[in-house]
A protein has these predicted regions:
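Active-site proximal loops enriched in glycine and acidic residues that flank catalytic Cys/His/Asp
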Residues: 177, 208, 236-238, 274-278, ...
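Glycine-centered loop/turn positions within well-structured domains
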Residues: 101, 139, 151, 181, ...
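Short flexible coil/turn linkers enriched for glycine and charged/polar residues
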Residues: 124-126, 137-139, 228, 238, ...
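Terminal RNA-binding accessory module
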Residues: 318-405
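Proteins enriched for Cys/Gly/acidic motifs involved in redox and nucleic-acid/cofactor modification
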Residues: 1-182, 217-220, 232, 254-265, ...
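Conserved SAM/AdoMet-binding glycine-rich loop
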Residues: 72, 81, 169-285, 296
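Alpha-helix N-cap/loop-to-helix initiation residues
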Residues: 13, 49-52, 79, 211, ...
Length: 405
């Protein structure tokens, strides 16, 4: 029997969907993440923005039209926020954000198990694995609905994470979660977890982190890893102190820049990426200019920008919203500034040597990512780790030649 699992939203959703797929495979199901004819469909939804919820509903309708008689199981943040929005789609069962472990059990109950044979070839090992270390968030930023849907922080036992790292066949591991900065297993914080991973030769990369967790202890622990990818996705949201206060972000522009400087002290070639919201409630032109200017001051290598989307149930929902035109114009300017910052970051690193883990071959070039997450293209078919030298900007990254010296 065949199951198709669709995923919308964040890396945590991807990890949780992968767990559902693995469990189904272990029970004999053939699984896929592409739209095709199947016996059942699972949709892991997102609710971070109105658009994400709309896409979730749209996907339900698309699956229903494609295969109207197959059972559809919906889970995730959008169904946690409002499960009723999916009932019109003829959905078999609806689960919240913290009920995803029940999806496979429900499928087993409905189908009475599965006695079909497992596929006779090994599952492909991906080059990058995402390991979830915690769930939930206690920050309650004024614009964010996720803490209400995911709940308070719950951290996985450190020993379980260590065992998963040991067992993981992928050469690169990304530590992920809703708010990994809040990781705490009986007093063992993120720095303690990093120290416990210093045995592994795998490349370790961090998911999105918050300002408060950046300190000497964490950075020293990261330097102790055998292969750390110094790419820090340090969430910003705004470069304006007034907007940061309204967002309930608990740091100032100056404090954020101090954290960036501390990172560069320990990792001079670090890549710092970030998120910025365009057009938050009450954002003045001066506030917005502060967000634009910090892109250069912080030396970001990449900026993920998006327009503010008011979410019901958050404190910002009742605040006066800016017009769609203003938000759209500001978003465009942020995206342009972010693109220029990324181009600058790449150009400054041409001629330098990096280690790339090969991921894909398109018939002409093998591609993979540097420690700082520059996508690199090397002519010819290659595998494993490559020592390369960046030569010039190319496609969505840089071309490179093999340099084994």
């Amino acid at each position: 029997m065949k199951a198709v699992v669709f995923t919308l939203g964040c890396k945590v959703n991807e990890v949780e969907s992968a767990a559902i797929m693995a469990e189904l495979e272990s029970r004999g199901w053939e699984v896929s993440d592409e739209l095709s004819y199947a016996d059942i469909y699972v949709l892991n939804t997102c609710a971070v923005t109105k658009e994400a919820e709309r896409k979730s509903r749209q996907l339900v309708a698309r699956v229903r039209k494609f295969n109207p008689n197959a059972p559809l199981y919906v889970c995730g943040c959008a169904s946690q926020k409002d499960g009723g929005q999916f009932k019109k789609g003829g959905v078999r069962a609806i689960f919240g954000a913290r009920e995803k472990q029940q999806v496979v059990s429900a499928i087993a109950n409905d189908f009475g198990g599965c006695d079909c044979q497992k596929l006779g070839f090994p599952k492909q090992v991906k080059t990058r694995a995402f390991i979830k270390i915690e769930d939930g968030c206690n920050n309650f930023c004024s614009y964010c609905v996720i803490p209400y849907l995911r709940g308070r922080v719950t951290s996985r036992p450190l020993r379980d994470i260590v065992e998963e790292v040991k067992a993981c066949p992928a050469p690169e591991i990304v530590l992920t979660g809703i708010n990994i900065s809040a990781y705490d297993d009986g007093g063992q914080r993120l720095a303690g977890l990093i120290s416990a991973l210093q045995f592994t030769d795998k490349r370790i990369r961090l998911g999105s982190i918050e300002c408060n967790v950046i300190d000497e202890k964490l950075l020293i622990a990261l330097k102790g890893l055998k292969d750390f990818a110094p790419q820090f996705h340090l969430s910003l949201q705004s470069g304006s102190d007034a907007v940061l206060r309204a967002m309930n972000r608990h740091y100032t522009r100056a404090e954020y820049l101090e954290k960036c400087a501390l990172i560069y002290t320990h990792f001079p070639d670090a890549a710092i990426t970030t998120d910025i919201i365009a057009g938050f409630c009450g954002e003045s032109e001066k506030d917005f200019e502060d967000s634009l200017s910090i892109i250069g001051e912080a030396g970001f290598s990449r900026v993920h920008a998006f327009a503010f989307s008011p979410r019901e149930g958050t404190r910002a929902f009742s605040l006066p919203d800016l017009s769609k035109t203003v938000k759209s114009q500001r978003l465009h300017r942020l995206l342009e500034a972010g693109k220029a910052a990324e181009e600058k970051y790449i150009k400054e690193r041409l001629g330098r040597r990096y280690c790339v883990i090969c991921e894909e071959y398109d018939g002409e070039y093998t591609s993979g990512y540097t420690e700082g997450y520059i996508k690199v293209y090397v002519r010819g078919e290659h595998s494993g780790k490559l020592k390369v030298r960046l030569t010039e900007p190319f496609r969505d990254g840089a071309s490179a030649i093999i340099d084994g010296q």
